[in-house]
Design a protein with these regions (language model features):
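Short coil/turn segments at secondary-structure boundaries
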Residues: 16-22, 152-154, 174-175
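Structured inter-helical modules in multipass membrane proteins
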Residues: 1-89
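Alpha-helical transmembrane anchor segments
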Residues: 81-173
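Acidic, Ser/Thr-rich low-complexity segments on the non-lumenal side of membrane proteins
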Residues: 1-11, 158-185
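Generic structural motif recognizing short loop/turn segments at the entrances and edges of beta-strands
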Residues: 14, 26, 148, 178-180
Length: 185
């Protein structure tokens, strides 16, 4: 699920990761869908339903697992909304103009109190506000591959390693380090 979600958010091809993790017939079925990540959730739901019908899962365990699949569906929906909802141009424009206007008028507001220190304080405060404006633009798409984007490869690798370790499947894949400057703490 996590690898497929990563590919969906980055608009890349999930085939290689799916083939590495799943049997070929499942990969073919998943890739035939227009929404592979949703298909994975559906298949997982079908699988736990079959286990329940076969008596291999209790009703309580089935209910808990079904709730977890619902939570994953909510995560998927939230990530899709973040990835596909653009910041309105008017919002970006008003934010930039407000920051520039504030930085332009700031020295006039400070000169009465700070006198000769006004340029230094104004530059420092203006730099901070202009940096926040630039940072907001940089973080608009957190799922990409730019330096300040989320390290999805490292996050998916951590999830995969944890699941394989919990189920006793060894050897574990090599640990991926976070992408670029982002640290997982």
């Amino acid at each position: 699920f996590s690898w497929s979600l990563k590919h969906q958010l980055r608009k890349t091809d999930p085939t290689a990761d799916l083939r590495r993790l799943l049997p070929e017939e499942r990969v073919t079925e998943i890739l035939a869908s227009s929404m592979p990540t949703n298909r994975i959730l559906l298949l997982a739901g079908n699988e736990i339903g079959q286990l329940r019908e076969a008596g291999k899962l209790s009703d309580i365990t089935y209910g808990l697992m079904d709730n977890k699949l619902d939570e994953l569906a909510h995560v998927l929906g939230g990530c899709e909304r973040l990835a596909t909802t653009p910041v309105p141009f008017a919002y970006t424009l008003i934010l930039q103009r407000t920051v520039y206007l504030f930085c332009t008028l700031l020295p006039f507001a400070l000169v009465g109190d700070l006198h000769y220190m006004t340029p230094f304080v104004s530059v420092f405060i203006s730099y901070t506000f202009l940096s926040w404006d630039s940072l907001a633009e940089e973080l608009e798409d957190p799922f990409g591959t730019a330096a300040n984007d989320l390290p999805l490869n490292a996050m998916c690798n951590t999830i995969e390693r944890n699941l394989l370790d919990m189920t006793g499947q060894h050897p574990l894949p090599e640990t991926l380090r976070p992408d670029r400057y982002f640290n997982l703490t």
